[in-house]
């Protein structure tokens, strides 16, 4: 009888099985997808300096080089997404040009050869801009990217500090070339253009019906904490289940 019980026990052991389940999880992360940041995240401050050239009604009377003057810009803004931001910028300093009218506003000095006069006046241009980070829009978010190109468009107004004081509406556009130095600091090369109402330089007329300024500046941007964007959890897109059945070896009696 003992032999019979041993045989039954061996048969039961042979029928036992162990199931091992293996899961294969494939996770992907959308390089364009980030979590919307709080209001006080991703603010920045920028300052820069460089040179500008004025294009007024009669500025072609003098050489281009003599219309170049110093300029500066100070900006504060926020990135709402890696590809879209807003900023407020104060720019300007001094504009230089020429006129044939001795009685025109902002004339400085005596008559020059060919019958024209120098113009010079101090001004500011306060404008709001919408910025588009093309690298983030087309290549996805990458906080360690060294170079990014950021075009912008905006509108504002000018104010001439020199007398007679004058205000004019302005539209603005440009390109920011951003070079990352650290998590907090960038170097910027900004190329900008402004078109203002024709009265900006104190004269009305000419071929275009507006006055313009082109400028190039080099500056620094500081990004306040909290900076950067967080990504959502990776998504589970597939799951494979594999089962392996292990039978115990049959015991001989």
Labelled PLM ranges:
Residues 83-168:
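Gram-negative (and chloroplast) outer-membrane scaffold detector with strong preference
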Residues 32-42, 83, 136-148, 181-184, ...:
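Short loop/turn motifs that connect adjacent beta-strands in outer-membrane beta-barrel proteins
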Residues 57-63, 98-105, 142-144, 162-171, ...:
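Outer-membrane beta-barrel translocator domains and adjoining extracellular loop/strand segments
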Residues 41, 66-70, 122-126, 147, ...:
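Residues that define the transmembrane beta-barrel architecture of outer-membrane proteins
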Residues 49-55, 90-96, 134-136, 155-161, ...:
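Transmembrane beta-strands of outer-membrane beta-barrel pores
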Residues 246-253:
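Single conserved hydrophobic/aromatic residue that forms the stacking wall/gate
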Residues 14-75:
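Short glycine/proline- and aromatic-enriched beta-strand/turn motifs that initiate or cap beta-hairpins
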Residues 47-51, 74-78, 128-134, 153-157, ...:
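Residues on the lipid-exposed face of transmembrane beta-strands in outer-membrane beta-barrel proteins
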């Amino acid at each position: 009888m003992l032999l019979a019980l041993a045989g039954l026990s061996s048969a039961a052991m042979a029928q036992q099985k162990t199931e091992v389940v293996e899961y294969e999880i494939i996770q992907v992360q959308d390089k364009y997808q980030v979590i919307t940041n709080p209001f006080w995240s991703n603010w920045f401050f920028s300052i820069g300096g460089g040179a500008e050239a004025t294009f007024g009604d009669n500025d072609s009377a003098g050489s281009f080089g003599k219309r170049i003057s110093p300029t500066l810009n100070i900006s504060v803004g926020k990135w709402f997404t890696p590809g879209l931001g807003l900023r407020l910028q104060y720019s300007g300093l001094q504009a230089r040009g020429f006129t044939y009218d001795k009685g025109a506003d902002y004339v400085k000095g005596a008559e020059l050869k060919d019958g024209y006069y120098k113009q010079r006046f101090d001004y500011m241009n306060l404008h709001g801009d919408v910025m588009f980070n093309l690298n983030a829009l087309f290549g996805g978010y990458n906080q360690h990217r060294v170079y990014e190109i950021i075009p912008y468009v905006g509108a504002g107004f000018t104010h001439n500090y020199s007398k007679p004081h004058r205000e004019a509406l302005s539209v603005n556009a440009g390109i920011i070339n951003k070079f990352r130095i650290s998590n907090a600091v960038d170097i910027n090369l900004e190329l900008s253009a402004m078109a203002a109402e024709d009265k900006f330089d104190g004269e009305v007329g000419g071929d275009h019906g507006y006055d313009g300024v082109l400028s190039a500046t080099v500056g620094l941007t500081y990004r306040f904490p909290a900076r950067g964007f967080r990504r959502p959890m990776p998504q589970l897109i597939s799951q494979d289940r594999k089962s392996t059945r292990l039978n115990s070896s049959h015991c001989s009696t």
